Amino acid sequence: LNGSNTIKIINHSDNDRVFVLSDLPQDYFLEIEVDNENGVISLNYICKDSEKSFISLAATLIPCAILLNYYLDNDYQRIIDSTKEYDYNFDVNCDAFEIFTGFETLSASKYLESTMVEAGIGIPVIHDKYSYCHGRSTLSKTYNNIAIYFNLGTDLDKLLLSELTKYCKEVIVLDSKPTLLSEYNLLVKCMYLTKYIASQKEKDLSGVDYNPIVKKLYRFKSGVW
């Protein structure tokens, strides 16, 4: 991620748009084709070099940016201006990462969960904040878990944040608002967060050492019944 240089538009017409990922236009492209007659929008990925991991900007942040750009009436400069780098500084060693989310922050929490599992950088446990009272709070009493909390500033958020510090080793608070742009920025924060956790554990998110079964399952086409 390179701050305001993360995404740029290099070509634009009524039916076609080409987006560049990072500062190297020759490396990654995401092209959008619009079929107005049939109401179909196609996203086509072009990558110069074969990616070594399923974890990539092309598969996560950029599609979200395309959709966000649509809902912002093609005000892509607003997306660029709002994108920035985020720094973290905490001990990442723990038994599990407890992720506190809700309907408004599902995209970011799903990214965290899948990336932690796929890259092998931590064990994620997803909590719906509104269901946390139903026995799930028992897990936090292990005292060696790290909480990642998506904070919208509600009364429930204030209550949970005041309590979690008593039971968790660390509470990482990611502030957000119930808006599309804010949810996009929350996803960016989570990308920097996973990058930090991976670096502390000396893992490479761009070159995950997958179990051999991964490719077998990825190409599996037989029956499941």
Regions found by a protein language model. Give the residues of each.
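Glycine-rich phosphate-binding loops that contact phosphosugars or nucleotide phosphates
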Residues: 1-84, 143-146, 150-176
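Proline- and acidic/polar-enriched loop/turn elements at helix boundaries
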Residues: 23, 128-129, 176, 210
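Secondary-structure boundary/capping motif
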Residues: 107-108, 156, 181-185
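Phosphate-moiety recognition in structured ligand-binding domains
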Residues: 165-225
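Small-side-chain structural scaffolding
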Residues: 20-22, 31-34, 39-42, 107-109, ...
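Active-site phosphate/pyrophosphate-binding segments
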Residues: 47-144, 219-225
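Short basic, glycine-rich beta-strand/loop surfaces that mediate nucleic-acid
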Residues: 141-148, 190, 194
